[in-house]
Every structure is written in C-alpha cells, then in structure tokens.
From Swiss-Prot:
Lineage: Bacteria, Bacillati, Actinomycetota, Actinomycetes, Mycobacteriales
Gene that encodes it: aceE
InterPro entries: PDC_E1_N (IPR035807), PDH/Transketolase (IPR051157), PDH_E1 (IPR004660), PDH_E1_M (IPR041621), THDP-binding (IPR029061), Transketo_C/PFOR_II (IPR009014), Transketolase-like_C_2 (IPR055152), Transketolase_N (IPR005474)
Source organism per UniProt: Mycobacterium tuberculosis (strain ATCC 25618 / H37Rv)
Function description: Component of the pyruvate dehydrogenase (PDH) complex, that catalyzes the overall conversion of pyruvate to acetyl-CoA and CO(2). AceE has reductase activity with pyruvate but does not react with 2-oxoglutarate.
Highest rank taxon of the organism: Bacteria
Keyword check for Oxidoreductase: yes
Name of the protein in its database record: Pyruvate dehydrogenase E1 component
Catalysed reactions listed for this entry: N(6)-[(R)-lipoyl]-L-lysyl-[protein] + pyruvate + H(+) = N(6)-[(R)-S(8)-acetyldihydrolipoyl]-L-lysyl-[protein] + CO2
Length: 930
C-alpha cells in the first residue's frame, strides 16, 4: 500500500513539462487533486509568505493565515475548517450584546443561592445523618445556571411550550436552593436532602430523579453520560413531533448542562454526530470546564477545552468558548505581539488548576512571569488585582453573550465551553483542590470566609452557636431581589424545572382489533416475532391510536418482518429522501420522508433507547402521549443499554420494548454474543419493567391490549412492557374456548390439561419457545412412561415473583393481618405431582417462583454461554428438549418415591440426553436473523 508520505514524495518527483504540478497530499493530511494552473503565481504567494514570516515572526504570519481562512469562509470558498482556535473567548468583546438584566440584583441573589446550596449539603452532614452531597460543582456553575434561569430557560406556560433543561446531576443542591428562594421548597425540605423516607414530611433526592420528585425534576442526568445522549434525542424528537404535525415545537430549546470530566463517558460524545446530521439548532450543550473530575484534573497535561472544541467542531457543531472574564479584556487588548495568547495556549490545565489553589503572587510569578512581555503587562497590577482576574464561566456578561449566540445560531447544535473553578467562592480549602469533590463540610473558618465573600447577613454568633447547623438565608418573598427573580420567571413562562403529570387522554382501540391474532395460524408456522409485528400492525391501523405509535428500529426491520411498514409509515428523515432508493421499484421499497413515522436509528441501540425515552415521556414533556415500540435483538437490549433503561424508568417512560430473536437456543448459528438466555433476569431488576415471555400469538394480543390500557388508559401507570419474542416458527393455536385472560396477564395458566388416565401425575411449566417441546414431552410421558402431565403456560416469571414478594413483604410488616396467597400458589394448589419448569432462559428465571410452588420443583434452563449450532443440538446440550424434560419429570417422581429410581436412569439412556449427536436434525425454518 502506498502511504501518504510516499504519495507526497511521488508528487514531488513527478513534475513534467506536459503536466501541471499536482499536490497529492498537503502537510496537514488534506488531500487535494487540483492542478496548479499558474505555478509562477503560486511561487510568488509562497515567497511572500516566507518574507512575512522572516520579517514579522510567526505570530503575525499565523494571524494573517487565520484571517485569510476566515475571509475564504466568508466568500464561500470550500476549504477545510480549523477545528481548534486560540485559548480565548470565541465572541470578541466588541460583539458582545447588551446585557438586559440588573446585574447587581442578580449577583446578590446568586450569592444567596450559593450560600443555601452549600449550607444544605453541610447540614446534611450533621451528627446522626451524614448522607453526603456535593458542594463544589454548583459553586463552579452558579453563573451558568443563573444566566439561563433569568434570561433563557422558558417554563411550560410560555406560549412556545417551554424549554427542556437537563441539569448536571451534581449541581442539584443549587437548583434546590433556587427553588427555596422562589418559595417552592421550605427550609424543612432542604433539611431532608438525601433523607427521602426518614425525614419527617419527606426529603429531597440526591440528584434529578423524576420518579422520586415527579412534580419537580424532568430529566435524570445521573449516571453520567446519559444526559447528553438523551438531550440529543429529545431535541430530535421535538422536531419529529413538529414535522409530523403533532405539536408545534419550533420555539422550544433543549439545554444540557455537563461537566468536562463527564465528557470522557462514551455516551457523552458518541452520538454528537446525530446532532449535526439532524441540524439540531434547538440544542445547546453547556459544558462546565472546571478542569477537574472526581479525583483530579481532567487533562492535567493537556487542555480539555481545546480538545472538546476540536471534537465538536469536527463533528459539525457550532462551538463557543467562554474562557476569560471581562477583567482580561484590557490585558488581551494590550497584548500587541500575542505573548499573552501564546501563554494561554501553552499552559496545561494542571497548571491552571494549581494557580487557583494559590494566590495572586503565585499567578504573577508562575504564569505571567514565564515571559518578560507578559510580566510587564501586569507590572502595575497588585497581587489582588491579578487574583481577581475571573474565568469566563463566572462572568455574567460573557455567559449571556454565549447563550444569546447559541439560541440565535441556525443549522447546527451549539456547544458552549465555559471555563470555571471547581469550588468557586467556597474558600481556599475548596477552590481548585483535587479533593474538593469529596468535601462535604465547611469548617467554622470556611463558613465565615464564605459568608463574607457572599455578603450573607448572618452573624458570627449564629455560625458559632452550632457550626453543624448554620442557617439558611431568605430575605422574604417581598424582598426586591426575590420579586425581581419571580418576575423574570413569570416573563419566561413559569418555574424551571417543573414536570407536569397530567396529559391528554387517548381513545384506545376496541377488542375486535386483536381478533385476527386470537384465531391461530391454521396449518401455517408463525414465529412469535411475526405475530407481534402483526399485532402492532393492526394497532397502527386504528385512526385514534395509530398516529401515536412510534416504531423504533436499530437497523433490523427486515429481520423482524417490518419492511412492509416502510411504504405506508415511511422512515422519518428531516430532509426527506434526496436520492433514488435502489429498491424504488419494489413494493417494499426503502422510503424516507420528513413526515415519516418510523425512527430508523441505524446500528445504534444507545440512540434507540434515547428515542424510546423521548417518545415514552412525551406525555409529560409535551402533553402529547406517544407510544414507542422499540424492537431489537434481545441480547443487545438490557445487556447493552441497561443503564439507559434504568434512566427510562426514572423518567417514567411508557411504551413497549420488544426483545426479538430471544432465547439461548433459538437464534440458530449466531453464537455466543447473540444467544440471549438472561435478558429476562436483567429486566426483572428494573422495577418499572413488566416483562412477558409469551408462547402464543393470542397471548401477545392480550398482553399488548393490557399494556395499552395500563400505560395509556384512564389511570396510566409509569411502567413499560418488555416482551420477549422468538424467530422460531411453529403453528399458533387459536385462543381456547371460554378463555379467561387473567392468567396470561398475571403470569400463569393451564394450557393443556391431561385427560389420560395414568398412574402418575406431573406438571410442566413452560414459557415462550419452550412450549412446543413441553407439549411433546407430555405426549411422550403419557405414551411411554405412564405419566399424565398438565402443561402450563408461564407468560411472566417476573410478575409471579413480584406478586409473591409483595405478599411476603406485607406479611412481614403486618403479621397481625390475614395473609394473602401468591397467584402461582393458588394456580397450582390442586395440581398433583411434581412441578418441572422449562424455558429457553437460565434456570434463575424460573427459580424466581420457587418459594411459592407447592411440592417438588425442578427447573431446567440454558445456563452457560450460547454457541453456534442447530436448535435441536443446542437444546440437547442444555437439556431443555422434550426428551430431557421427560427424564426430569421421571427423576422428580422417583425423588418423591412415586416410581423406582431405575426408571429415569433407563429413560436417560434410552434418549441419550447427554449426547448432542443423538439430537434430531433441525426441521423448522431457521427464521430471520439467523
């Protein structure tokens, strides 16, 4: 392979009189194949540049090159853009807009908020409590939030619908402190910080948790990294609602506040390209660059602001840097030869952190003193003057200018990189210290210094009386500053954050819409994945509920048989379809549209869950209930994006999550990474997930109907359904006569009652794709081993477990009350014989109900890694096939003393259940996805 360097050498040595020079590779790696049509003019330009460099030096030469690039951009000359600029503010002083507020008034109550935020965390460390908290994050970002609260963040009563603000999790104390001044929270509630159950009257959650504070918080932003991901997809979903004509979101903006340390999370940056590709100019990231993460510097040897600027600019974002406060303006103006800018460019972040952990004299010597020219710039400044040189993120006007530029910018999302100091204004023991993130308390000396710098009217006596409980400060709702604060919120449409839980009601489809699924498939073999897709296809046809469905697919629509949705529903794309699809002449052509209904996310499960959350919480965010249906390979759901599903539960998302190609043995040939035998276990750990493992199409119909009623009915629940469906086709039976669906929804019902008169009885519990083998095992037991076995369909091991746990918890807490009986116990109480449970999942799945199964209980499952092979071979290996079930039943009967122990031994030998080679050949269709 010819390298770039080799091509460069070839280009230099291949000049000929008959062919103009061609520059193959420019030094920075940007390829160009344009011919040099005037070598003489080119030579003159290069000689002129060399002369300039020699006469004026590199600073002047660099400046002119940058100006030429800027002019080329203005003239729309197609050249590569620079990804990194000098370590100075993006917006020049002369272009800063007029600041519309009263800066003095806003500064005063900003100080009160800082004080109350720190005191709340400090008081939470009082003896007997000690629940932790974070003081320093909000201290560094107070100005960033307050500019937004006073001038940009619009509440839900705003005519445009209001903004969505993702607040950095560790900054929650400051948001509570503001709500205290607004009169939304009391001092008693602040004292309940991180004591949600033990504090009298209830407490406040540690971070933004909507489920724990449903009228206040909107967006959960811990764990770190999920905030930026979800903000991107929230902004995209706002456009989706607008483009489909569901809601006018054109005047709504999404703000996401982040920390520079958080940007190392893969989710923080991994989907930045989506914001650019979608042109999300309704989205602004504000990254608080205090240069510190939890234990130390983010980039001690580097420059995180420069790194993030290059990353986001390269990803197609508009980047605004807010590095220096107004006190630096005069120094930068006097920096005629660029010495100060050069110092700023070359000083690593570790040094900037150290400067703010010292004093003005240290900064004079170790920063300005590194160059005689910069040392001369500050020779008339005192050490205190130097110490008072603020960073940009603490300057109201600089921050306002950046926010105004961000909301006015069109065509791109914007990221604002604001430089701050962690622990700002908290005193010398906090500011810039590596340990500041873990510091929860202030000493008496710290309290007094903090009080003085913030000008809080609290006396020494009040602080000394009980240093564990320094007082909050509130001047009263009639104070001019508080009236000003509340006036600003009224003008902007109400309080932020605020979550509204009431939304418009939906008219659910009638039961007749599910009738086709309850008739069975006749002689046709149909996989439950196909049955599920057909169920939702029927729901989509409903004129009331259909437009509210949001199908979300990570590039597997054809695998799941959903390509038939492309022509009718179309794939959402803000730009429509600007090309001719290769399959345009086919009935099931790939069709994109700006009014498309399908969110086709590509190979991107993380982004798919982001869309699921945005759609599933639209009822609260927009008063527009939507019903997301997210379908994926089950192995790549809760295992890959379980953290996001936990956030979905916190945000109280509603919708359907479909784990397709489920099971450890069903997805033939795909192997270890695809063979899912445990997603139901992972789903069971999420309290908001209602998980089902249906075997038949009619069960799916009842489950979907129940899900719509529970999530979108008169009294909607804050849950989402997880339904595992399979790609193995088999005949779907019709709904039994006089069928009561309660068992389907509660988790278990008897599907097949043995009518044969046999010496012994047994019960087989089966779920999902294990059902056909269970029915065959029952036939074999009756025909060959004198055992009559009932077969039960277990649609939800998890719901049966929760029912049992709830009853036991009630008994523990109230032993004096009559005890309930778990549903599974009641179902099996009159069933004779041992109970054997089988599924295509790990044994731990059916083991969830062991405490409440009467009598002998034996479980079979697919423990261990999956592998590539046929279904019969895999099931023989895991011993979940019909033959293994027969042996398990006989073993249980022998253990109960009902048959001789030699019987299961003989059966095991007869069927060779320990020999994979003895498994039958695969006869069923391998199904899609294999």
């Amino acid at each position: 392979m010819t390298t770039d360097f080799a091509r460069h050498d070839l280009a230099q040595n291949s000049n000929s009189a008959s062919e103009p020079d061609r520059v193959r590779v420019i030094r920075e790696g940007v390829a160009s194949y344009l011919p040099d049509i005037d070598p003489e003019e080119t030579s003159e330009w290069l000689e002129s540049f060399d002369t300039l460099l020699q006469r004026c030096g590199p600073s002047r030469a660099r400046y002119l090159m940058l100006r030429l690039l800027e002019r080329a951009g203005e003239q729309r000359v197609a050249i590569p853009a620079l990804t990194s600029t000098d370590y100075v503010n993006t917006i020049p002083t002369e272009l800063e807009p007029w600041f519309p507020g009263d800066e003095d008034v806003e500064r005063r109550y900003r100080a009160w908020i800082r004080w109350n935020a720190a005191i709340m965390v400090h008081r939470a460390q009082r003896p007997g409590v000690g629940v932790g908290g974070h003081i320093s994050t909000y201290a560094s970002s107070a100005a960033l939030y307050e500019v937004g609260f006073n001038h940009f963040f619009r509440g839900k009563s705003h005519p445009g619908g209001g903004d969505q603000v993702f607040i950095q999790g560790h900054a929650s104390p400051g948001i509570y402190a503001r709500a205290f001044l607004e009169g939304r929270l009391t001092a008693e509630q602040l004292d309940g910080f991180r004591q949600e159950h033990s504090h009298v009257g209830g407490g406040l959650p540690s971070y933004p948790h909507p489920r724990l504070m449903p009228d206040f918080w909107e967006f959960p932003t811990v764990s770190m990294g999920l905030g930026p991901l979800n903000a991107i997809y929230q902004a995209r979903f706002n456009h989706y609602l607008h483009d489909r004509g569901i809601k006018d979101t054109s005047d709504q903006h999404v703000w996401c506040f982040l920390g520079d340390g958080e940007m190392d999370e893969p989710e923080s940056r991994g989907l930045a390209h989506v914001g650019a590709l979608e042109g999300l100019d309704n989205l602004t990231f504000v990254i608080n660059c205090n240069l510190q993460r939890l234990d130390g510097p983010v980039r001690g040897n580097g420059k995180i602001i420069q790194e993030l600027e290059s990353f986001f600019r390269g990803a197609g974002w508009n980047v605004i840097k807010v590095v220096w406060g107004r006190e630096w303006d005069a120094l930068l103006h006097a920096d005629r030869d660029g010495a100060l800018v050069n110092l700023m460019n070359t000083t690593p972040d570790g040094d900037y952190q150290t400067y703010k952990a010292n004093d003005g004299g240290y900064v004079r010597d170790h920063f300005f003193g590194r160059d005689p020219r910069t040392k001369a710039l500050v020779e008339n400044m005192s050490d205190q003057d130097i110490w008072n040189l603020k960073r940009g993120g603490h300057d109201y006007r600089k921050v306002y200018a950046a926010y105004r530029a961000a909301v006015d910018h069109k065509g791109q999302p914007t990221v604002i990189l604001a430089k701050t100091i962690k622990g700002y204004a908290l005193g010398k023991h906090f500011e810039g210290r590596n340990a500041t993130h873990q510091m929860k308390k202030l000493t008496l000396e710290d309290l007094k210094e903090f009080r003085d710098t913030q000008r809080i009217p609290v006396s020494d006596a009040q602080l000394e009386e009980n240093p564990y409980l320094p007082p909050y400060y509130h001047p009263g709702l009639n104070a001019p500053e508080i009236r000003y604060m509340l006036d600003r919120r009224r003008a902007l449409g109400g309080f932020v954050p605020e979550r509204r839980t009431k939304s418009k009601a939906l008219t659910l489809p009638g039961r007749d819409i599910y009738a086709p699924l309850k008739k069975g498939s006749g002689h046709q073999e149909v996989a439950t994945t196909m049955a599920t897709v057909r169920t939702f296809k029927e729901v989509l046809r409903d004129k009331q509920i259909g437009p509210r469905i949001v199908p979300i697919i990570p590039d597997e629509a054809r695998t799941f048989g959903m390509d038939s949705w492309f022509p009718s529903l179309k794939i959402y794309n803000r730009n429509g379809q600007l090309y001719t699809a290769v399959d345009a002449d086919l009935m099931l052509a790939y069709k994109e549209s700006e009014v498309g209904q399908i969110l086709h996310e590509g190979i991107n499960e993380a982004g798919s869950v982001g869309s699921f959350i945005a759609a599933g919480t639209s009822y609260a965010t927009h008063n527009e209930p939507m019903i997301p249906i997210y379908i994926f390979y089950s192995m790549f759901g809760f295992q890959r994006t379980g953290d996001s599903f936990w956030a979905a539960a916190d945000q109280m998302a509603r919708g359907f999550v479909l784990g397709a190609t489920a099971g450890r043995t069903t997805l033939t040939g795909e192997g270890l990474q695809h063979a899912d035998g445990h997603s139901l276990l992972l789903a069971a750990t999420n309290p908001a997930v209602v998980a089902y493992d249906p075997a038949f199409a009619y069960e799916i119909a009842y489950i979907v109907e129940s899900g719509l009623a529970r999530m979108c009915g008169e009294n909607p629940e804050n849950i989402f359904f997880y339904i595992t469906v399979y790609n193995e086709p088999y005949v779907q039976p019709p709904e039994p006569e006089n069928f009561d669906p309660e068992g389907v929804l509660r988790g278990i019902y008897r599907y097949h009652a043995a009518t044969e008169q046999r010496t012994n009885k047994a019960q087989i519990l089966a779920s999902g794709v294990a059902m056909p083998a269970a029915l065959r095992a029952a036939q074999m037991l009756a025909a060959e081993w004198d055992v009559a076995a009932d077969v039960w369909s277990v649609t939800s091991w998890g719901e049966l477990n929760r029912d049992g746990v709830a009853i036991e918890t009630e008994k523990l807490r109230h032993p004096d009350r009559p005890a309930g009986v778990p549903y599974v116990t009641r179902a099996l109480e009159n069933a004779r014989g041992p109970v054997i449970a089988v599924s295509d999942w790990m044994r731990a799945v059916p083991e969830q109900i062991r405490p409440w199964v009467p009598g002998t209980y034996l479980t079979l499952g697919t423990d261990g890694f999956g592998f590539s092979d046929t279904r019969p071979a895999a099931r023989r290996y895991f011993n979940t096939d019909a033959e293994s079930q027969v042996v398990a039943v006989l073993e249980a009967l022998a253990g109960d003393g009902e048959i001789d122990p030699s019987v299961p031994v003989a059966a095991a030998r007869q069927y060779r259940i320990d020999d994979v080679a003895a498994a039958p050949e695969q006869t069923t269709d391998p199904g899609p996805g294999a």
